[in-house]
Curated annotation (Swiss-Prot):
It comes from Pediococcus pentosaceus (strain ATCC 25745 / CCUG 21536 / LMG 10740 / 183-1w). GO terms for biological process: translation. Coiled coil: none annotated. It comes from the Bacteria. This is Large ribosomal subunit protein bL33B.
Length: 49
């Protein structure tokens, strides 16, 4: 099965800063610490669908 593009949104400000290819069969949401340009620091980013 092909990978789907999902957006990673900052949990602090809600800005969608990154897009990644993710396996659609995965049931839990992807959560990664990434840099947010709007917050100007590293924050937790979670998958949006």
């Amino acid at each position: 099965m092909s990978q789907k593009k999902v957006a990673l949104a900052c949990t602090v400000c809600g800005s969608r800063n990154y897009t990644v290819a993710a396996n659609p069969q995965r049931t839990d949401r992807l959560e990664v610490n990434k840099y947010c340009k709007r917050c100007n620091k590293h924050t937790l980013h979670s998958e949006t669908r």
